[in-house]
Amino acid sequence: MNRKYRKTVIAGNWKMNMLASEIKPFMEELKENLPKTRTCEMVLCTPAVMIPAMVKAGKDCKVAAGGQDVSKYEKGAYTGEVSASQLADIGAKYCIVGHSERRQYHGEDDMLINAKAKALLEKGIMPIICVGESLEQREMDLTMEYVAYQVKAALSGIDASQLRRCVIAYEPIWAIGTGKTATAEQAQEVCEGIRAVIRGIYGARPARAVSILYCGSMNAKNAQELLAQPDIDGGLIGGASLKPVDFATIVKATDQD
């Protein structure tokens, strides 16, 4: 993995799992299994109500706290929403936007995802912007056409200085929560394509510096092969991030230089 120009990020997405009371024992077990030295940045994205507990428990392991979604609005009469300033106030350093589950179950479109990413950047939170194709789109050979459109839409109006604080996560929708995984070659091909799209917008240097993660059933068994690919700079981990030993194993897999 080439770490010369960009950081490696291993981020967990706990989705609607775990309790705040379970975070401390989780972190204690994680610490026991982590390597003494590591070059990657670790993030755990929890439901918003659990972020303060993650901030507190994560300090010892140097795990950053992240959110799973954010409102495009700064404040107001938006019942149930959480703003970027509220996330920042409780210690979130990262936040996922555009996850396929948000797109599917909540009807989120690219314009909304772009607005959310901008809201996060304004408050100093790094957005993890998810893009990816369905099985139908892959079978129709439309993967890069669709993913390129998502990338361009998500980054619309974001300048090169802001791009440096963005992370892109490629999530083949057909591999989310299904146990199916894109081959390392398939994942690399799309991540390389994403970097090419960014290069076309911002130029070679900014594109070279963007961290691109793979999000599609990465686990302790396949992480090393996926993370060895030149354009995969980490992972956005679902189920495996709920298991301290497995998450630590994925972190160890980043040390391949």
PLM region spans:
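Active-site loop-to-helix "anion-binding N-cap" substructures in soluble metabolic enzymes
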Residues: 1-257
